[in-house]
UniProtKB/Swiss-Prot annotation:
Compartments reported by the entry: Cytoplasm
One Gene Ontology term of the molecular function aspect: (3R)-hydroxyacyl-[acyl-carrier-protein] dehydratase activity
UniProt-listed CDD domains: FabA
Gene Ontology CC: cytoplasm
Subunit (UniProt): Homodimer.
Catalytic activity: a (3R)-hydroxyacyl-[ACP] = a (2E)-enoyl-[ACP] + H2O; (3R)-hydroxydecanoyl-[ACP] = (2E)-decenoyl-[ACP] + H2O; (2E)-decenoyl-[ACP] = (3Z)-decenoyl-[ACP]
Matches recorded under SUPFAM superfamilies: Thioesterase/thiol ester dehydrase-isomerase
Protein name, per record: 3-hydroxydecanoyl-[acyl-carrier-protein] dehydratase
Pfam families (UniProt xref): FabA
InterPro entries: FabA, FabA_FabZ, HotDog_dom_sf
Source organism (scientific name): Allorhizobium ampelinum (strain ATCC BAA-846 / DSM 112012 / S4)
Length: 171
C-alpha cells in the first residue's frame, strides 16, 4: 500500500493550483496572490481533537505582501477574510488529498472570531484545520474547525468550516 504524502512544499502547492496534483476537474488551490500559505507542514487522516484528521500549514509574512499597501493605507493589516479563506483553502485541499473527486467550493462557516491582527511586523502565520466529519454523497462535504496563529498566538478561530467538492454534471 502506498503511503500518502504528509507535507507539501511551495512548488507542490502551486502544482495543485494549476490542477496538476489531484487531476483536472478536482480539488484545486488558488494561485498567488490569493494562495494564502507557503507550505503544508502536516496532513493526516487520523488525529486531531475529533480523531477525524487534520491539516497544518504556514505562511511567511513579509512587509511587501500585496494586501498591506491597500488595507489600510497608513495602517497596514492583513484582511481577516484572507485568513478565513486560507482555512477554506486547506479544508478543500484535504478533501482532494483524500482522493475525493470534484471541484472545491467554500459553503459556509459557523462562527468566526478575530482576536488579533497580522501586520507587516508579523513573521509567521500558522493554520490548523481539525476535521469533524467528511460526508460522501451527491457531493463530498468536509466539516472542520480551524485556527490561525500569528507568531505563535492564536488570533482567529472558526467553527464548522464547510467545503464541498462538486462533480461536473453530465449533459
Amino acid at each position: 500500500m502506498n503511503e500518502k504524502q504528509t507535507s507539501y512544499n511551495y512548488d507542490e502547492i502551486l502544482a495543485c493550483g494549476r490542477g496538476e496534483l489531484f487531476g483536472q476537474g478536482n480539488a484545486q488551490l488558488p494561485l498567488p496572490p490569493m494562495l494564502m500559505f507557503n507550505r503544508i507542514t502536516d496532513i493526516s487522516e487520523t488525529g486531531g481533537p475529533h480523531d477525524k484528521g487534520y491539516i497544518r500549514a504556514e505562511f511567511d509574512i513579509t512587509s511587501d505582501l500585496w494586501f498591506f499597501p491597500c488595507h489600510f493605507q497608513g495602517d497596514p493589516v492583513m484582511p481577516g477574510c484572507l485568513g478565513l479563506d486560507a482555512m477554506w483553502q486547506l479544508t478543500g485541499f484535504y478533501l482532494g488529498w483524500l482522493g475525493e473527486p470534484g471541484k472545491g467550493r467554500a459553503i459556509s462557516t459557523g462562527e468566526v472570531k478575530f482576536t488579533g491582527m497580522v501586520t507587516p511586523s508579523t513573521k509567521l502565520v500558522e493554520y490548523g484545520i481539525d476535521f469533524k466529519r467528511v460526508m460522501r454523497g451527491r457531493l463530498v462535504l468536509g466539516i472542520a474547525d480551524g485556527w490561525m496563529k500569528a507568531d505563535g498566538e492564536v488570533i482567529y478561530k472558526a467553527t464548522d468550516l464547510r467545503v464541498g467538492l462538486f462533480k461536473e454534471k453530465a449533459d
